A protein has these predicted regions:
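N-terminal Rossmann-like NAD(P)+-binding domain of SDR-like oxidoreductases, especially those catalyzing
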Residues: 1-174
Length: 174
């Protein structure tokens, strides 16, 4: 099972649709989203009855939401798309960016570490159950933004993953 945090936003929704359309593996996807200004439950109208899709309204700034979803679903992978976005908003109202993008992600990481520590190293069974999760198979993926690299003029080469971070707004710094 894959837990997609912040999956009702633009990028998260597109990831969910792409994953559900994948023919190679059919794995349950649970989306947790707080449905703030950028999250839209209507994005999922066409898949709301898909047996591999579940939506839970929750917030990474609320530790009990994270604890509950980890206990109930025991994900193999967690992909965090949740973030307050938009450079201009981060300059005029940085508090919500700090709350979600820093404290919320910290809460998520803290509870994921606790969850990870409860997982077995790996299975001794030759044929593991389909939903088996171990320390060896668990993954946490944090989605970010190209804004972390700062500004780029048209004469400069494209950024690569090796470029140093040079955030220039509360959004990109968070």
């Amino acid at each position: 099972m894959i837990l997609v945090i912040g999956g009702a936003g633009f990028i998260g929704t597109n990831f969910v649709f792409r994953k559900l359309q994948s023919t190679s593996d059919k794995e349950e996807i649970v989306v947790m989203d707080s449905l703030t200004y950028s999250g839209n439950l209507d994005n999922f109208k066409s898949i709301k009855n898909n047996k591999f899709f579940t939506f839970i309204q929750g917030d990474i700034t609320k530790e009990e939401d994270i604890e509950n979803i980890l206990k109930k679903y025991r994900p193999r992978s967690i992909i965090n798309f949740a973030a307050e976005t938009h450079v201009d908003r981060s300059i005029t109202s940085p508090d919500i960016f700090i709350q979600t993008n820093i404290i919320g992600v910290y809460n998520l990481l803290k509870h994921c570490l606790n969850y990870y520590q409860t997982l077995p190293q790996e299975s001794n069974e030759k044929h593991q159950p389909e939903n088996f999760v171990s320390k060896k198979t668990f993954r946490f993926i944090q989605i970010s933004t190209d804004e972390v690299y700062g500004s780029l003029s048209s004469s400069e080469p494209s950024f690569t993953e090796d470029h140093p971070f040079r955030p220039n707004s509360p959004y990109s710094a968070s």
